[in-house]
Design a protein with these regions (language model features):
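Helical element adjacent to the flavin cofactor pocket in flavoenzyme catalytic cores
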Residues: 2-72
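Short, hydrophobic/amphipathic alpha-helical packing segments
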Residues: 19-23, 185, 189, 209
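Mid-domain catalytic core of redox enzymes
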Residues: 41-200
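A glycine-rich dinucleotide-binding beta-alpha-beta segment and adjacent secondary-structure elements
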Residues: 198-209
Length: 209
C-alpha cells in the first residue's frame, strides 16, 4: 500500500460532513426557489419531441401518475434505463448502444475499527494520507477501501476509531448481493486481514451495510 506508484490528490474540495451535505444544500436551494422535491417517485416515461425531452411522467409514492412539462431534464439514471423509458422518435442506433451497456452493482460496507494509535497521532494524514485504496488482487472480492477519517475528521466522532467504507462489486440479486449484513461484515474483516490492512487483534466496534 505504500509503494512508489502511489497516486494521491494533494488538494480538493470536500463537504465537511460528507458528500450527502452537498445534496442537502442543493435541496435547500431548490426549495427556496419554489421547487418541489418528490421523494419515493419513479420516472416511467420521457417524451422525446424534435430531439428534445419536453415532458416526463412519474409515479408518486402514493401510486398516482403525474405528467410534467420541462424546459430542462437532468437524468442520473443508467443510460440503458433512460433510453428504455423514452417515447417518440428515438434513433434505433442510440437504443441499441444503450441496451448493450453493462453496469456493475456495488455493496458498500461501513466498518468501524478501534484504533488507539489515532488518538496519539501515530496514525495520521502525515504518515498515512490515503483516502481511497484500490485492491487489485484476483483472489480478493474487496475492490476499494475508503478511509473516512482522511476525507474529513468531522465524519468520525471518536478519535480512537477508524471508519472505513469497503466497496464490493457484484450483480444485483447474486450470492454476494443477497448476503446478510453480518455475513458481509465477516467477509470484509477477513479480507482486510488477508491483505494486511488490519491485524487479528483489532476490535470491530460496529458495521453497517
Amino acid at each position: 500500500m505504500h509503494g512508489e506508484n502511489r497516486v494521491q490528490t494533494e488538494y480538493f474540495l470536500y463537504p465537511k460532513l460528507g458528500a450527502g451535505q452537498m445534496w442537502q444544500e442543493v435541496a435547500e436551494k431548490i426549495k427556496k426557489r419554489g421547487g418541489i422535491i418528490e421523494l419515493g417517485a419513479m420516472v416511467d416515461s420521457l417524451v422525446l419531441d424534435n430531439n428534445m425531452l419536453k415532458k416526463i411522467s412519474y409515479i408518486k409514492s402514493n401510486g398516482k401518475r403525474v405528467f410534467e412539462e420541462a424546459d430542462v431534464v437532468i437524468s442520473t439514471m443508467p443510460l440503458s434505463s433512460l433510453f428504455a423509458n423514452m417515447t417518440g422518435n428515438v434513433p434505433i442506433s442510440l437504443r441499441t448502444i444503450a441496451d448493450g451497456l453493462k453496469y456493475r452493482d456495488c455493496v458498500i460496507m461501513g466498518l468501524c475499527i478501534k484504533w488507539p494509535e489515532l488518538a496519539n497521532g501515530a496514525f495520521s494524514m502525515e504518515n498515512f494520507p490515503e483516502r481511497m485504496i484500490y485492491v487489485q488482487d484476483p483472489k480478493i472480492k474487496l475492490a476499494r477501501i475508503q478511509v473516512y477519517n482522511n476525507w474529513s475528521p468531522y465524519l468520525v466522532k471518536k478519535k480512537n476509531e477508524l471508519w472505513l467504507g469497503l466497496e464490493f462489486f457484484c450483480k444485483e440479486g447474486d450470492d454476494f448481493w443477497n448476503l446478510s449484513e453480518d455475513e458481509c461484515a465477516k467477509i470484509a474483516v477477513s479480507e482486510l486481514k488477508k491483505i494486511g490492512f488490519i491485524e487479528s487483534g483489532r476490535e470491530v466496534v460496529c458495521y453497517h451495510r
